[in-house]
């Protein structure tokens, strides 16, 4: 159907209704008869004259602000990857078109690029529709801002709009999250020996750092990368023989202590491999590890229990929860099977993080939880209170750009 310049369609039998939901807002609702449909999706297409538009920004664009073409691969967004907002602006930094979507949890595919034949910006949006349970209705709101304002002002409007229409709210930020942090990764990589860490923390504390984030390596004597030894989450005794005493010595320096966990991985060499090797989204042979499937309640319970026990046993102040974006999306996941209590990966990850947040804040209300790009969207920010730029070793420019983008 064509509705005020929008071509809206579904690739399966569905009734479509469009209506204005506010200035620049279009609410699209689909209803259908429950049945078996192959890769059902909602498609929305429209064109915008390419006038006074020179640049494009979206949350994971990095240093590339160039306009894309209509044949470029679409940008994927989901609960744990990016955010559904795209801003097109001119040389002066003035907004010419900002596109946002109320769907901040499930997968969306965005293709907004130059169409050479007629000099327009061809906008194509695809939303795979989950056919789970008894769902026979789906609504989504498309926001298009054309006001002449600074593009960062348009983005602030989108952030406020998300809170209103998607019921997303950030996790409270403790004071400690705003103070200087020292991360051990580039200093030590996996060579995280307690005495060396404590010596570095002495210097860090003198320079004003108030928290240390001890990264990958504390849990294994193997320092050859990969994640084959993740999953047991006990300190390597030859590196950190007494974790609680080690944390206490860092606390005595006036620093808080955060610990790294690769949330998704259970390693082939861990004691838990036999338990969880049949509860995986996929097996990463390079990493020598499996990616846990959070649709199984046993997986979620194991992860929550792991963090709760660590917090209690070692008096930690926070967690660096890594690789959450590696859970991926439902369209790439194995079929639903017996033992799962969720059909959608995105919903299961949301449930996992809800349980983690509630369990940890019940024990320590000012707990620090760090996430990184790419999982920085409006829905996931309710579960973390520190967000960092993706790894960019010795690349100060990418780091600065990433900080601004965050």
Predicted regions and their residues:
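N-terminal accessory beta-strand-rich subdomains and adjacent acidic, glycine-rich linkers
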Residues: 1-161, 168
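Hydrophobic, Leu/Ile/Phe/Ala-enriched alpha-helical segments that form helix-helix packing faces
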Residues: 32, 75, 86-92, 101, ...
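Structural alpha-beta junctions
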Residues: 37, 50-52, 207-209, 253-254, ...
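Terminal accessory/anchoring regions of large secretory-pathway or extracellular enzymes
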Residues: 146-174, 178-180, 189-192, 196-201, ...
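Aromatic-lined carbohydrate-binding/catalytic grooves of carbohydrate-active enzymes
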Residues: 178-182, 186-308, 312, 316-318, ...
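Alpha-helix-loop-beta-strand connector modules within alpha/beta enzyme cores
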Residues: 241-250, 255, 341-366
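Glycan-recognition surfaces
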Residues: 268-289, 293-301, 305, 347-406
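Short glycine/threonine-rich loop-to-helix capping motif typified by GTGT followed
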Residues: 333-344, 382-384
């Amino acid at each position: 159907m064509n509705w005020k310049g929008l071509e809206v369609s579904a690739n399966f039998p569905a009734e479509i209704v469009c209506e204005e939901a506010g200035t620049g807002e279009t609410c699209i609702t689909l209803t259908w008869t429950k049945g078996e449909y192959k890769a059902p999706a909602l498609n929305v297409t429209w064109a915008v004259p390419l006038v006074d538009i020179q640049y494009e920004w979206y949350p994971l664009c990095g240093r590339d602000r160039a306009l894309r073409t209509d044949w470029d691969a679409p940008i994927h967004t989901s609960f744990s990857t990016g955010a559904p907002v795209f801003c097109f602006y001119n040389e002066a930094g003035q907004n010419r078109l900002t596109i946002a979507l109320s769907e901040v949890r499930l997968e969306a595919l965005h293709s907004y690029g130059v169409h050479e034949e007629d000099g327009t910006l061809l906008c194509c949006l695809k939303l795979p529709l989950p056919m789970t349970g008894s769902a026979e209705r789906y609504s989504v709101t498309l926001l298009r801002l054309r006001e002449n304002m600074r593009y960062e002002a348009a983005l602030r409007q989108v952030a406020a709009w998300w809170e209103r229409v998607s019921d997303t709210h950030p996790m409270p930020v403790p004071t400690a999250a705003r103070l200087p942090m020292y991360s051990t990764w580039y200093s030590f990589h996996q060579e995280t020996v307690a005495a060396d860490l404590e010596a570095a923390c002495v210097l860090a504390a003198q320079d004003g750092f108030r928290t240390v984030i001890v990264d990958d390596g504390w849990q294994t004597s193997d320092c050859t990368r990969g994640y084959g030894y993740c999953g047991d989450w006990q300190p390597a005794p030859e590196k950190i023989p007494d974790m609680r005493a080690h944390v206490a010595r860092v606390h005595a320096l006036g620093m808080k202590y955060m610990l790294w966990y690769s949330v998704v991985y259970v390693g082939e060499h861990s004691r838990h491999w036999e338990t969880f090797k049949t509860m995986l989204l996929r097996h990463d042979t390079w990493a020598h590890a499996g990616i846990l499937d959070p649709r199984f309640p046993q997986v979620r319970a194991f992860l929550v229990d792991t963090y709760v026990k660590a917090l209690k046993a070692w008096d930690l102040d926070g967690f660096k929860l890594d690789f959450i974006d590696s859970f991926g999306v439902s369209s790439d996941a194995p079929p639903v099977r017996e033992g799962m209590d969720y059909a959608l990966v995105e919903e299961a990850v949301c449930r996992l993080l809800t349980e983690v947040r509630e369990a940890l804040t019940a024990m320590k209300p000012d707990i620090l939880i760090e996430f990184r790009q790419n999982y920085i969207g409006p829905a996931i920010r309710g579960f973390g209170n520190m967000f960092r730029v993706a790894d960019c070793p010795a690349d100060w420019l990418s780091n600065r750009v990433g900080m601004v983008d965050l």
